[in-house]
Amino acid sequence: MIVCLEVLVIVLMRLAWYLAMVAVTVLALLPIEHLQMPVFDWWDKAQHALAFVVLTSWALLLWPHAAMRVALRMLAYGACLELAQRAVGWRFAEWADLVADAVGVVVAWGLVRWLRSQQSTSIESNSR
């Protein structure tokens, strides 16, 4: 019974992650009417990095044994978003956005590694 509940939680968390990915994709491709963008907008880059920290951290926790694949796929997802933005015509692609996405992936990687090291340290100290 407990195993079934754990599996259900994992399945629901993965479903929620996929829905979050769809939501980010939709938001990234929505037309932005009458938006005057500065040449380089730090807030936009911070939003990219934060979105990728959250999505990548979440994915790394859901698929702990596929960390490198998760990181590479998140980078590919960021590149695909930029290409899609270029293709739709009402958005535009920026290399700086892709760099911000990559920063988010790297920060997530480091954060999850640190959290796991803290968890293993805590388990070791509790077993003594």
What are these regions (language model features)?
Residues 11-15, 63-71, 94-95:
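Membrane-helix interface segments
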Residues 34-42, 81-106:
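Interfacial helix-loop-helix junctions of multi-pass membrane proteins
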Residues 50-67, 105-116:
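Membrane-interfacial alpha-helical segments at the cytosolic side of multi-pass membrane proteins
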Residues 1-60, 74:
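"…centered on the first transmembrane helix and the immediately adjacent amphipathic helix/loop
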Residues 1-7, 118-128:
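Membrane-interfacial, low-structure loops and terminal tails that flank and connect transmembrane helices
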Residues 55, 62-85:
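Membrane-embedded catalytic cores of phosphoryl/pyrophosphoryl-handling enzymes
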Residues 24-28, 74-82, 105, 109:
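Alpha-helical transmembrane segments of multi-pass membrane proteins
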Residues 30-31, 64, 89, 116:
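Short helix-capping/hinge motifs at transmembrane helix termini and TM-loop junctions
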